[in-house]
Amino acid sequence: TFSGCKNEPSSEQKNDKIVYSNIVSEKVQNDLMKILTDSSITTERQNVLFDHIKQFNSIVNSKNLVSDFEEYDAKKTKYDPYDMQDEWNQKSPNFMGYNCRITAFGIYRDFLEIPQNSDVNNEMILFDLSALSEDSSVLLKKNDENAFSIFYSVVPTTLTKDIDTHVATLQESWKNRGIKFAKNKKASLISVMFHESIDENDNYLFVGHTGILFESDKKLYFLEKIAFQEPYQLTRFNNRSELNDYLMKKYDVSYDQPTVSPFIMENDQLLQEYKRITD
């Protein structure tokens, strides 16, 4: 079961160091602003993102957030996810906040071509749609809510552990629905795909976690919203192998299941450095 974007605390990682910030300090916010601008993210979309970041960071206890870029054990978050969830619910009882899919869509929407004539299966994004009904500020274009539902609709698949089969199924679904990823030399959409199996004849893929990958000054920066009541995080990597390891150690946590392991897409292609972590 995935945890990254659901309304529940995210799972822990194994013992590894990562360099990240919760985008609290003015310096990191300015760094991110430059990265976004260099990646052709519009000022309007940046304003929405920073409004949401500042809203979250003002509601939770700043002592539990990483202000500047610091190295931390990825397994030991500075915050307790359950305490942070309680803190958010006390101060914002009528709004659950924003999750990874809402955040990534809001940033990257201008580089997604999503025709409006597709069927929709909202089974895995009901919390997302509830949040968007309370605050639709990321939906800047006409029909964006429908586009959101189309893009994150579950994709029927087969009960197999063969990743190539699932990647081809996902790509074919996007192609058949006319979904295209526009070229952006400095940014791409990262999607961690999960396989849900109800029974042998009822299987589907869905985006369990997502974020935006930026290239800047020969480094990679992965921007994500960890979960509804967990922070925004900007993590710095040297290469895509480090990104792969970070995501797979966090989300590939099931064993002996009949479904395929989570796999990572960069736009509409399997992440070139994708591999399972077997330690």
Regions found by a protein language model. Name each.
Residues 31, 38-39, 45-197, 204-208, ...:
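Acidic/His-rich structured neighborhood in mature extracellular/periplasmic domains
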Residues 10-38:
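N-terminal low-complexity, Pro/Thr/Ser-rich intrinsically disordered segments
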Residues 6-8:
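Bacterial signal peptide processing site
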Residues 222-225, 238-279:
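Low-complexity, Gly/Ser/Thr/Pro-rich intrinsically disordered linker/tail segments
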Residues 2-4:
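C-terminal motif of bacterial Sec signal peptides marking the signal peptidase cleavage site
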Residues 35, 107, 246, 250:
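Residues that form generic nucleotide/phosphate-binding pockets
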Residues 229-232, 237:
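Extended, aromatic/histidine-rich regions of cofactor-dependent oxidoreductases associated
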Residues 11, 199-201:
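Intrinsically disordered, low-complexity coil segments
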